[in-house]
């Protein structure tokens, strides 16, 4: 090897190795101080890219887990509000059951409806004011997407539904609304109610006054209706008619009449004080003149005593064919009922509803006048109309009864099948609560899965970018030794050119 001064190859070689060990020492110290194997892309370009993607996923999934917890909070907030709505609905149902009981007075129903209205208003208030972080969760139908992944499209949707009185089908819910008026309601709820029921018997039309029961013809100028005393037929003639049969007269009868012979025979066969019946009336033998049949008998008709005298029977006669009969009063037999009477004619009586029914009259509509207005009622009396519109009985704020038509009653009408309506509302609330409960469980599962994934990704990233302290400490020790050795050797290498000086001596 040539002996030169200008170039110290050994020194250069030693410096180069010293630089290498310096670089190794710097790298080891950097890794040990940061805890990372990859501190820059030059440490491991591919590993750095992989670890960076892991970091993105880990950070995204960690935030997704927080998002899922927010989703649980939203569901819990909504479900809590629905629970209170459910409580109000249960109370409304309880009150509705109470209202359907027939023992309630008008004031009872008003009190019940007042509380129901307050409960329904509270449901609307809860719906409008319940919110999570400024988002109203029950005031409208909405789909809220919760990001539960580190990438696009990785979401879980919470279906939020509008839950208020209207959406529950309880808008206008009422247990104390106007009820369809009946004729009975008009009579009991209003004063000075007048009117009549109509009846038809064949071609004949009649009216029956709803208050007095008087029967008249159904005409613009109605006539009073009577019952014919003889045949029971309806008539507008009130004159006396149906002449009665003059059975016992104050003038002596001709000999041998049926009545004279019958009574003479009773006297002949009896004794004074005996009684006997004739034509359904009891007679008493007052006197008996011998045993031929002559004598007197008496009876009481309509509270008055009547004496009949039998005479002109020849003493010792074998029969009573010569008997004559004379009465202290004229006595007649009614052709209507066959009873004894002092009247020679029977007067027609005013017709009654029972007389119409006896003549097979069929009830028609009724005309009822209330506060000057005339209403029409059907034959059953359970539907009252005015100008073709069904009428309802309502109450003013002061509790006074009033009549309103079907148009005015529509907005205030009692809810048909109120319990079924509330049960339907409860079912809807239950369905929404069930959905929210299920979504909470789903979020719990998603959070658990996200935690597992983050743990595994952290482990994977650690294996790529975290420093192995055993290895790095070993590398640092090696580099330190090489540094010390290199420094010592470099000092000796720098002295080598001085050997040339010995050649100059």
From Swiss-Prot:
Question: Its principal location?
Answer: secreted
Q: Spell out the subcellular localization from the entry.
A: Secreted; Bacterial flagellum
Q: Which GO terms describe its molecular function?
A: structural molecule activity
Q: One GO cellular component from the entry? A: extracellular region
Arranged from A to Z, the UniProt key words for this protein are:
Bacterial flagellum, Secreted
**Other remarks on this protein:** Individual Salmonella serotypes usually alternate between the production of 2 antigenic forms of flagella, termed phase 1 and phase 2, each specified by separate structural genes.
Physiological role: Flagellin is the subunit protein which polymerizes to form the filaments of bacterial flagella.
Indicate the family of this protein.
Answer: Belongs to the bacterial flagellin family.
Question: What's the protein called, per UniProt?
Answer: Flagellin
Organism lineage reads as: Bacteria, Pseudomonadati, Pseudomonadota, Gammaproteobacteria, Enterobacterales
């Amino acid at each position: 090897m040539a002996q030169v001064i200008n170039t110290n190859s050994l020194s250069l070689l030693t410096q180069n190795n010293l630089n290498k060990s310096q670089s190794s020492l710097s790298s080891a110290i950097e890794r040990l101080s940061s805890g990372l194997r990859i501190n820059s892309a030059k440490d491991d370009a591919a590993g750095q890219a992989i670890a960076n993607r892991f970091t993105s996923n880990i950070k995204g999934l960690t935030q997704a887990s927080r998002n899922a917890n927010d989703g649980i909070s939203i569901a819990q907030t909504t479900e809590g509000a629905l629970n209170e709505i459910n409580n109000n609905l249960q109370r409304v149902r309880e009150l509705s059951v109470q209202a359907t009981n027939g023992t309630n007075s008008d004031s009872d129903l008003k009190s019940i409806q007042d509380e129901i209205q307050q409960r329904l208003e509270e449901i609307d208030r809860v719906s409008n004011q319940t919110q999570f972080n400024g988002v109203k969760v029950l005031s409208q139908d909405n789909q809220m997407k919760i990001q539960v992944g580190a990438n696009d499209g990785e979401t879980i949707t919470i279906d939020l539904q509008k839950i208020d009185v209207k959406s529950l089908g309880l808008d206008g819910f009422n247990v104390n609304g106007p009820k369809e008026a009946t004729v009975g309601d008009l009579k009991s709820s209003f004063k000075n109610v007048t009117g009549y029921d109509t009846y038809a018997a064949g071609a004949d039309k009649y009216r029956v006054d709803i208050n007095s029961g008087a029967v008249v013809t159904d005409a613009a100028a109605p006539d009073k209706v009577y019952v014919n005393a003889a045949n029971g037929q309806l008539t507008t003639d009130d004159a006396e008619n149906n002449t009665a049969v003059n059975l016992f007269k104050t003038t002596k009868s001709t000999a041998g009449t049926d009545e004279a012979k019958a009574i003479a025979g009773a006297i002949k066969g009896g004794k004074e004080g005996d009684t006997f019946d004739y034509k359904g009336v009891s007679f008493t033998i007052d006197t008996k003149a011998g045993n031929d049949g002559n004598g007197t008998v008496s009876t009481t008709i309509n509270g008055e005593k009547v004496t009949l005298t039998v005479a002109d029977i020849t003493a010792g006669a074998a029969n009573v064919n010569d008997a004559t009969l004379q009465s202290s009063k004229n006595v007649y037999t009614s052709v209507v009922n066959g009873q004894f009477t002092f009247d020679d004619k029977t007067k027609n009586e005013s017709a009654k509803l029972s007389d119409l029914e006896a003549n097979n009259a069929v009830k028609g509509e009724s005309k009822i006048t209330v506060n000057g207005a005339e209403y029409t009622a059907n034959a059953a009396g359970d539907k009252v109309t005015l100008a073709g519109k069904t009428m309802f009985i309502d109450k003013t704020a002061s509790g006074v009864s009033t009549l309103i038509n079907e148009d005015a009653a529509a907005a205030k009408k009692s809810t048909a099948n109120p319990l079924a309506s509330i049960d339907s509302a409860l079912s809807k609330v239950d369905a929404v609560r069930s959905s929210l409960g299920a979504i909470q469980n789903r979020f719990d599962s998603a959070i658990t899965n996200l935690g597992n994934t983050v743990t595994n990704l952290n482990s994977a990233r650690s294996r790529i970018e975290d420093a192995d302290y055993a290895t790095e400490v070993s590398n640092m020790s090696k580099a330190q030794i090489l540094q010390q050795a290199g420094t010592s050797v470099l000092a000796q290498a720098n002295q080598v050119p001085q050997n040339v000086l010995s050649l100059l001596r």
